[in-house]
């Protein structure tokens, strides 16, 4: 069975005075698409979606594209397929969909991109529209554009999932891409990309800070230590849990981090606490050994990975929303600051060591995060 890496994101296109697709109801559409695509492998297995579904390709010339201005080439086959959904460009026939694509291309070029952001676009009319094509990098996703094909659904009625003919066209396009060697059939792992991970301008007033507040070692009362240095930028972000008590208040969390450091140094004879950063149920991020020093909990990955541990046990129930958001913000921060490579891989502790960490409930969540690799 062919294995697919599907990255799903809601692409929010924002510019004043262009058209109604500037202010989509992203939450509603996102949830629907996540549910729709979550079982895509099962649809293949059950025969609901055939591997050889035919599709009609509309060339750039046919839909009236401006001359392409992109020059960065893709090396084939790529390992990643990034599927987006563009809300607000409703169309159900070739004429209207072509007009919407011309508007979209003009918007992207106006925002200093070299062309329309995607390799291909699938209209709700069931046609596949050529974007920058098979051999050129799109601008659809900062972390994947040089190793992926970016394909976007467009034309759907706001609040609805793509039509059956659009889904069939998408499946046909994917099958064709694999058969022709444009897309690798190697399995990696499904993951979920948020809109802020794309290259699209975020909505005003909703842009996240580059980094969360990190409680420094001096504030939680760390002991001095001298650990081996990291090899930066790290290639991996590894998620763990401490498998002990948790904390929901800053003073509790500071005490817990101190106790954990003492356990590592006194009982395990480690150079310091075993993690680069720790996350509490108070939504706080606590500096462990920090950006530049190695942790001691990820075996042969210590020097090339950032270890982020949730304080507590998360086998049955996951961390709360504040803690999960803090960890995701920290990962984004690491990329922005250059401590983590943009093409990093995210893994659970159990993926690199014989352990139950980070707990099944937490693991089920992180495997939907960007860059996850089992």
Swiss-Prot record:
Keywords: Antibiotic, Antimicrobial, Disulfide bond, Glycoprotein, Immunity, Innate immunity, Repeat, Secreted, Signal. One of its GO terms (molecular function) is peptidoglycan binding. GO terms for cellular component: extracellular region. One of its GO terms (biological process) is negative regulation of natural killer cell differentiation involved in immune response. SMART domains: Ami_2, PGRP. The gene is Pglyrp4. It comes from the Eukaryota. Disulfide bonds join 211-333, 227-271, 247-253. Ubiquitous. Peptidoglycan binds at residue 275. It is found in: Secreted. Residues 76-212, 233-359 form the N-acetylmuramoyl-L-alanine amidase domain. Glycans are attached at residues 39, 93, 146. Belongs to the N-acetylmuramoyl-L-alanine amidase 2 family. Residues 1-20 form the signal peptide. Homodimer; disulfide-linked. Heterodimer with PGLYRP3; disulfide-linked. InterPro entries: Amidase/PGRP_sf, Amidase_domain, PGRP, PGRP_domain_met/bac. This is Peptidoglycan recognition protein 4. Pattern receptor that binds to murein peptidoglycans (PGN) of Gram-positive bacteria. Has bactericidal activity towards Gram-positive bacteria. May kill Gram-positive bacteria by interfering with peptidoglycan biosynthesis. Also binds to Gram-negative bacteria, and has bacteriostatic activity towards Gram-negative bacteria. Plays a role in innate immunity. Residues 294-303, 354-355 are annotated as: Interaction with murein.
């Amino acid at each position: 069975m062919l294995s697919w890496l599907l990255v799903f994101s809601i692409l929010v296109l924002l510019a004043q005075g262009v058209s109604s697709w500037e202010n989509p109801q992203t939450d509603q559409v996102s949830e629907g698409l996540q549910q729709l695509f979550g079982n895509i492998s099962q649809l293949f297995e059950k025969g609901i979606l055939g591997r050889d579904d035919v599709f009609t390709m509309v060339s750039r010339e046919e839909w009236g594209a401006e001359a392409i201005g992109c020059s960065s080439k893709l090396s084939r086959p790529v390992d990643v397929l990034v599927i987006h959904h563009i809300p607000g460009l409703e169309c159900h026939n070739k004429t209207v969909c072509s007009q919407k694509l011309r508007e979209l291309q003009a918007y992207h070029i106006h925002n200093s991109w070299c062309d329309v952001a995607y390799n291909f676009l699938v209209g709700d009319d069931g046609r596949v529209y050529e974007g920058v094509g098979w051999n050129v990098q799109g601008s659809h996703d900062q972390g994947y554009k040089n190793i992926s094909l970016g394909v976007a659904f467009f034309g759907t009625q706001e609040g609805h999932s793509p039509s059956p003919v659009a889904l069939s066209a998408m499946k046909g396009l994917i099958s064709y891409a694999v058969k022709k060697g444009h897309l690798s059939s190697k399995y990696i792992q499904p993951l979920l990309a948020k809109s802020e991970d794309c290259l699209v301008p975020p909505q005003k007033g909703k842009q996240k800070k580059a980094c969360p507040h990190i409680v420094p070692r001096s504030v939680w009362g760390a002991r001095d230590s001298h650990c081996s240095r990291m090899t930066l930028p790290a290639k991996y972000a590894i998620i763990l849990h401490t498998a002990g008590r948790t904390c929901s208040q800053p003073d509790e969390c500071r005490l817990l981090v101190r106790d954990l450091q003492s356990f590592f140094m006194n009982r395990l004879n480690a150079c310091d606490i075993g993690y680069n950063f720790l996350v509490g149920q108070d939504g706080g991020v606590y500096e462990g050994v920090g950006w530049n020093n190695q942790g001691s909990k990820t075996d042969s990955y210590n020097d090339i990975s950032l270890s982020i541990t949730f304080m507590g046990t998360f086998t049955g129930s996951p961390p709360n929303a504040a803690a999960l958001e803090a960890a995701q913000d920290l990962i984004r921060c690491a990329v922005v600051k250059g401590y983590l490579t943009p093409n990093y891989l995210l893994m659970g502790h159990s993926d690199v060591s014989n352990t139950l960490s980070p707990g099944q409930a937490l693991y089920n969540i992180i495997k939907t995060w960007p860059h996850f690799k089992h």
